[in-house]
């Protein structure tokens, strides 16, 4: 593939992209920490765990949905990946709950 012209990016745009990516990374780190806590069975069954996960997902979705302009394509890609992650998390959370509470079906 050849480029017929030059591509230029302002330093401010690069700084903005980096800032947004750092924000997304921070939110996913928070979610990962919550998953670590959920590995403890007594924490998984608590209402606090549900609220922690809900807040983490909500924060990450807010950051991602706020990406505008040149970052909108990036935001769409991240949101697609996040949606697949959320769906898988919901599935495995349900499977774990079945095991924990000895539910069939």
UniProtKB/Swiss-Prot annotation:
Q: Which GO terms describe its cellular component?
A: extracellular region
Please state where this protein is localized: Secreted
UniProt keywords (A-Z) are: Secreted, Virulence
Q: According to the record, what happens upon gene knockout? A: Deletion abrogates the production of EsxB and affects the secretion, but not the production, of EsxA and EsxC.
Assembly and partners are described as: Forms heterodimers with EsxB.
The protein in question is named: Type VII secretion system extracellular protein D
Q: What is the lineage of its organism?
A: Bacteria, Bacillati, Bacillota, Bacilli, Bacillales
As recorded in Swiss-Prot or TrEMBL, the protein's gene is named esxD
């Amino acid at each position: 593939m050849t480029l017929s012209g030059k591509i230029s990016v302002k330093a401010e745009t690069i700084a903005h992209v980096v800032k947004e990516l750092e924000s997304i990374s921070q939110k996913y780190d928070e979610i990962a920490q919550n998953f670590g806590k959920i590995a403890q069975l007594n924490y998984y069954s608590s209402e606090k765990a549900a609220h922690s996960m809900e807040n983490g997902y909500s924060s990450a979705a807010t950051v991602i949905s706020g990406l505008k302009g040149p970052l909108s394509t990036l935001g769409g890609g991240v949101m697609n990946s996040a949606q697949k992650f959320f769906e898988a998390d919901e599935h495995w959370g349900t499977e774990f709950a079945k095991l924990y509470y000895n539910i069939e079906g």
